[in-house]
Structure formats: structure tokens, C-alpha cells
């Protein structure tokens, strides 16, 4: 029997007031693949990610994780699905009052009541080493660099050994060298942990490095879906303008308002 895709989005529609953000959106993410969602600000990328996490409910359509619809789930059933997913937030979202070790152990403490404190600490230390960090366990987030915070965030996301990793702008705020190192870590996690990755990003260099497939979200729809090579070579004027970062083309540029 063929396994279902890790993530299936079917005819997903979401509006806020009179603004339709997602319009009849459909795509699948096969197991073990890395899919990058690109698109301009306000195009619905974060809204889409919140639906996958079931932080938002669609107006219509369906979201399936491992073939199971999550739209109607609640309570323990929803918690079980969420344990299959690890989230890496844009700003790392570490707890300032906790050490790095405590941050990584947080999910284990909350969801693995069957584990002793010693076992939880062992797993947390193991995940910290896996993301390439040393001697940060007793440090607080304010005492480490932005790149290290990203790694601690990834360590926390993999602590419960999820099947799916969701990344929200993982290279934002990093210099090119650190951004490349995070991309390499994402690829390492995919290879060693056999996870499926869904990545929201504005960083085209990152998308080209890590993606098996890139989906371009524009005006609430998947405007283009293709491999990194297909995206690079696309004749599509909308996608081409976005990828090249050009100000002239079909995508309007909104000028910043200035004070009188």
C-alpha cells in the first residue's frame, strides 16, 4: 500500500473580512521532500503555515497530515497530530528566562511524561550536539548569537522526533555565511532524521540550495510550482520579476508613505 503524502492541502480558502488571502489552494508534499513556499509580503505564506499547524481553520477546504484530516480535530487527537510536526520560528522564539538546554527540553517536559528528568536532559543534550553546538547548555538566549539561536530553535523542534519540520523564514536576519550554514543544517536534518520539510522563505539563494520543489504563492494561489532549475529558467514574468528582485514588471511596488 502506497503511503499518503506527508502534507496534503486541498482547495484551501481563507478570508479575513473582505480580504481573500488563500484561494482554492491545493498541493501535496511527498514524504522526505523539502518544499519551499516563496512569495511577497502579504501573499499568505504565514497564513498557510498556520493552517498546517492548525492554528487557523479554513473557510473551506482540507488539510491532511499523513492522510488524516486535521480540520475537525481537537483535544488529544489534535495534540497527537501536532507531535508529528516540529516548528522552527522566524525569530527562534526561545524563552528568555530559560537556558538553551531548558528550551530544547521544554517540549519533552510537556509531552513526554513517561521520561525521567535524567532521560529528558540526555535527549536535549543529544539534540544540541546534533545541530552542531557545544557548551551552550547553560547559556541563556541573550548570551548567544543569532545563528546559534536558530540552531537551538532547530534542536528544540527535533526533540520530539517529528516526521515533519516547518520552518518560518529560517535564514532571516543572518549574514550570507550563517544563512548557508543553516541551509546545510536543514539538509543534514533531512538526511539523518528522514523528515519532510515545509519552508517559508523570502531567501531565493536558500530556496535554490535546499528545495526539491519551489511553490510561488501569488494573489492567494500557487502561481508556479517547479524544481529550482525550472524556477531559475522560468519565462513567467511574475515569477521572474520576484526571483530577480526587479522593481519593474507585473508585481506592483508599493511606495512607502512619507510624513508631510
Functional labels for PLM-detected ranges:
Residues 68-69, 117-135:
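Conserved ABC ATPase "signature" region
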Residues 101-109, 121:
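Short helical segment in ABC ATPase nucleotide-binding domains corresponding to the A-loop/adjacent helical element
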Residues 165-168:
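Catalytic Walker B motif of ABC-type/P-loop ATPase nucleotide-binding domains
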